């Protein structure tokens, strides 16, 4: 608080895949809860992604021999196979406790077009065919791990798909001939498709989803002093319709990180399920931030005359300060003053239902600037105030604003005799409200980021204040390129 200072399923699935076991026995300072609505959205987005990937499948040519009593022996070949259309309809994404996620797709269809050749002795015939694949079901488990950089890894396991209905339509001069052994041909086409679908899913997870997960932040900078640690503290807690993902959420000094000795209290999350995702942020995160700021001297402030508005009725020199303490003018004629404000201890954020507030305790020491440029202390004052905090969440970060009550001032020590505390209190409140707090609010407006992967945006935000933690509900949108 310085015055005149400064500092394939790429979607909500990205959040789900943060659920990797890490340090055991540590309470998180941030929890992300994904509801059944969020899982449903992730499955829907994943379905669109897989559907696009299906069009990229390259189907191999295949051939075989046939023998028909009335015709004799011959060879056939199917080539230039291309997927013309595909419809992936029903899908579900469910937690797989202790392992990861389970994706199921049902009631889907694929249309394939290609060409055929038949050869018997010196006779060669050719034509085209259409293949309608119906009642396709796909299931795959997504197993989660973690790499040395503390980012999640994902591998596809147990992929299976079944085609229950397949119809081959052959055109050409001897289409009737191929229809005589269509069961054999359909069986081969079915095996090719089933193999290629799982191969496509494996490739999509390896080439698309895994690199996407590398965009998830492990740490993020808040300002020139603070950073936040988004590493994970435990395995996901899978329930009937939700999945809780637990982050360390630890605020630290970017220039000198030290271990946090105060344990984070347990957060009892409400059973809300109206929105896709909920963020629970412990008051511990905010209190560590104020402690780091305090240790770095960032909460201290200095007031000099050149920092006051030009039209201010009060100047920081001994002549103008005579109404506060008459003796100062006689003892230190025509000298400038400097006020140094220090916060006695790191203020704690009071988080209770409907209330966010701070009660910082400060001391202000007045110095006379001597002709030698040395400073001489002439008075010390104690200052207490209540500051209410409002937080705002946008689609990627948390921002704040302070709303202070009037500061109360008491005299601790005066080396210049009588001191008009009430007059100084009025001056201090004017300065705090018009200079100091606006500067602080400008810094708070920069906010700190939420742990979101690329192209994820939040909307329909719902902010709640509970005992010892803040709770933000939101719906999610994946922003396609």
Swiss-Prot record:
Disulfide bonds join 159-198. Its main location: secreted. It is found in: Secreted; Cytoplasmic granule membrane. Keywords: Antibiotic, Antimicrobial, Disulfide bond, Glycoprotein, Immunity, Innate immunity, Lipid transport, Membrane, Secreted, Signal, Transport. Glycans are attached at residues 300, 355. SMART domains: BPI1 (SM00328), BPI2 (SM00329). GO terms for cellular component: cell surface; extracellular space; membrane. Residues 1-25 form the signal peptide. GO terms for biological process: acute-phase response; cell surface pattern recognition receptor signaling pathway; cellular response to lipopolysaccharide; cellular response to lipoteichoic acid; defense response to Gram-negative bacterium; defense response to Gram-positive bacterium; detection of molecule of bacterial origin; innate immune response. One of its GO terms (molecular function) is coreceptor activity. When bound to LPS, interacts (via C-terminus) with soluble and membrane-bound CD14. PANTHER family: BACTERICIDAL PERMEABILITY-INCREASING BPI PROTEIN-RELATED, LIPOPOLYSACCHARIDE-BINDING PROTEIN. Belongs to the BPI/LBP/Plunc superfamily. BPI/LBP family. This is Lipopolysaccharide-binding protein. It comes from Rattus norvegicus (Rat).
């Amino acid at each position: 608080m310085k015055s005149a200072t400064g500092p394939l399923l790429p979607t909500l699935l990205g959040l789900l895949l943060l659920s990797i076991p890490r340090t055991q026995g540590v309470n998180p300072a941030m929890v992300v809860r994904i509801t059944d609505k969020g899982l449903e959205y992730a499955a829907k987005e994943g379905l669109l992604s897989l559907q696009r990937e299906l069009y990229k499948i390259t189907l191999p040519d295949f051939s075989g021999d046939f023998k028909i009593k009335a015709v004799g022996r011959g060879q056939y070949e199917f080539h230039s196979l291309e997927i013309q259309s595909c419809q992936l309809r029903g899908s579900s994404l469910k937690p797989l406790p202790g392992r990861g996620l389970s994706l199921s797709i049902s009631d889907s269809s694929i249309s394939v077009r290609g060409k055929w050749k038949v050869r018997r002795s010196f006779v060669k015939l050719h034509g085209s065919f259409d293949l309608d694949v119906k009642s396709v079901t796909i299931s795959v488990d997504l197993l989660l791990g973690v790499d040395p950089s503390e980012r999640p890894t994902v591998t596809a396991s147990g992929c299976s798909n079944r085609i229950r209905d397949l119809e081959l339509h052959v055109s050409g001069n001897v289409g009737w001939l191929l229809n005589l052994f269509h069961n054999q041909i359909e069986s081969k086409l079915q095996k090719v498709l089933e193999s290629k679908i799982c191969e496509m899913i494996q490739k999509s997870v390896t080439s698309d989803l895994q690199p996407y997960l590398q965009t998830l932040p492990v740490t993020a900078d808040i300002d020139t002093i603070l950073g936040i640690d988004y590493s994970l503290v435990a395995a996901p807690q899978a329930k009937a319709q939700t999945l809780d993902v637990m982050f360390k959420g630890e605020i630290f000094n970017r220039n000198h990180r030290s271990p946090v000795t105060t344990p984070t209290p347990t957060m009892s999350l409400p059973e809300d399920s109206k929105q896709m995702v909920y963020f629970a942020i412990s008051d511990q995160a905010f209190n560590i931030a104020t402690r780091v700021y305090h240790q770095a001297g960032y909460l201290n402030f200095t007031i000099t005359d050149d920092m006051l508005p030009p039209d201010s009725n009060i100047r920081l020199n001994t002549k103008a300060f005579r109404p506060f303490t008459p003796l100062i003018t006689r003892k230190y004629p025509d000298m400038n003053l400097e006020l140094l404000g220090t916060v006695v201890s790191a203020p704690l954020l009071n988080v209770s239902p409907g209330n966010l507030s701070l009660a910082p305790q400060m001391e202000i020491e007045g110095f006379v600037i001597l002709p030698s440029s040395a400073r001489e202390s002439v008075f010390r004052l104690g200052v207490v105030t209540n500051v209410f905090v409002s937080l705002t969440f946008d689609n990627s970060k948390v921002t704040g604003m302070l709303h202070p009550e009037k500061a109360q001032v008491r005299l601790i020590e005066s080396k210049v005799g009588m001191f008009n505390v009430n007059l100084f209190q009025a001056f201090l409140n004017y300065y705090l409200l018009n200079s100091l707090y606006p500067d602080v609010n400008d810094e708070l407006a920069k906010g700190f980021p939420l742990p979101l992967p690329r192209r994820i945006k939040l909307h329909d935000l719902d902010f709640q204040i509970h005992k010892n933690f803040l709770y933000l509900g939101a719906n999610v949108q994946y922003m396609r390129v």
